[in-house]
């Protein structure tokens, strides 16, 4: 099917192109579903740490439109189930996390791990297998440092693998740095960004707004 026609997005000084050809571990071209910053309020000031871009396989639009076309953007933005359907849907996803402020690999992986474990415990699905996957996830980041402008890249494959890659200069590498075969981890990394307690409300708003428009066009086909 034809790739949805979407625009590029800019978050701070990070540009996310409208399409991504064959990200690491994938043979597909993905489109930019949405983007936004992750930040925290520190002493009455909103400090932005990372810019997050979320790309989706073209089949995401018909897959999600069945249930969600015709719903207003604010309803999609507030719907936990809508984002859960993106997280668990049978299509590839790619997340680019680009640093606005510097972070170490340890800082990043520990925070993401915490969020993933919290999600699993809330859903009642935390097992030894997930514990091992988290250990591997943390070890992949152990020796990494991320100055401003560098990126962490995740490819989520529908069969349950999470490919992790790194870029220091904004380019997308052809080959992944590591693959972790754990479906719940691959889903939880994305859920930690856009789920019920996701770290980027701006990315959620962007996804809801852009996908809502794409659903309208899909309905006309």
UniProtKB/Swiss-Prot annotation:
Broad EC category: isomerase
Gene3D superfamilies (UniProt xref)? 1.10.890.20, 3.50.70.10
Binding annotation for substrate? 50, 115, 192
As recorded in UniProt, its EC number(s) are: 5.5.1.6
Can you provide one Gene Ontology molecular function annotated for this UniProt record?
A: chalcone isomerase activity
Pathway entry: Secondary metabolite biosynthesis; flavonoid biosynthesis
Q: Which InterPro entries match?
A: CFI, Chalcone_isomerase, Chalcone_isomerase_3-sand, Chalcone_isomerase_bundle_sf, Chalcone_isomerase_sf
Gene Ontology annotations of biological process type: flavonoid biosynthetic process
* Any coiled-coil regions, as ranges: none
**Residues at the site labelled Important for catalytic activity:** 108
Give the reactions, separated by semicolons, that this protein catalyses. a chalcone = a flavanone
Q: Which domain of life is it from?
A: Eukaryota
Q: Which Pfam families match?
A: Chalcone
SUPFAM superfamilies reported in the protein's UniProt record:
Chalcone isomerase
- Name the keywords, alphabetized: Flavonoid biosynthesis, Isomerase
- In the UniProt entry for this protein, what further remark is given in the free-text comments? Part of the biosynthetic pathway for all classes of flavonoids, a large class of secondary plant metabolites, many of which are brightly colored.
**Which family is this sequence assigned to?**
Belongs to the chalcone isomerase family.
Outline what the protein does: Catalyzes the intramolecular cyclization of bicyclic chalcones into tricyclic (S)-flavanones. Responsible for the isomerization of 4,2',4',6'-tetrahydroxychalcone (also termed chalcone) into naringenin.
What name does UniProt use for this protein? Answer: Chalcone--flavanone isomerase 2
What lineage does the source organism belong to? Eukaryota, Viridiplantae, Streptophyta, Embryophyta, Tracheophyta
Identify the coding gene: CHI2
């Amino acid at each position: 099917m034809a790739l949805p026609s979407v625009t590029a997005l800019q978050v701070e000084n990070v540009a996310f192109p409208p399409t991504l050809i064959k990200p690491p571990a994938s043979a597909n071209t993905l489109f930019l579903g949405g983007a936004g910053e992750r930040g925290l309020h520190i002493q009455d000031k909103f400090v932005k740490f990372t810019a997050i871009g979320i790309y989706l396989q073209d089949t995401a639009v018909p897959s999600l439109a069945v249930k969600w076309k015709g719903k207003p953007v604010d309803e999609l933005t507030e719907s936990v189930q809508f984002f859960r359907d993106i997280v668990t849907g049978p299509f590839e996803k790619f997340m680019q996390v680009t640093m606005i402020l510097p972070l170490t690999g340890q800082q990043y992986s520990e925070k993401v791990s915490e969020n993933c474990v919290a999600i699993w415990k809330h859903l009642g699905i935390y097992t030894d297998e997930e514990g091992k996957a988290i250990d591997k996830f943390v070890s992949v980041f152990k020796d990494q440092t991320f100055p401003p402008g560098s990126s962490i890249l995740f490819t989520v494959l529908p069969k349950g693998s999470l490919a992790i890659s790194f870029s220091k200069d904004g380019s997308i590498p052809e080959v992944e740095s590591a693959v972790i075969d754990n479906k719940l981890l691959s889903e939880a990394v994305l859920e930690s960004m856009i789920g019920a307690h996701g770290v980027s409300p701006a990315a959620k708003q962007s996804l809801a707004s852009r996908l809502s428009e794409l659903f309208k066009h899909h309905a006309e086909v």
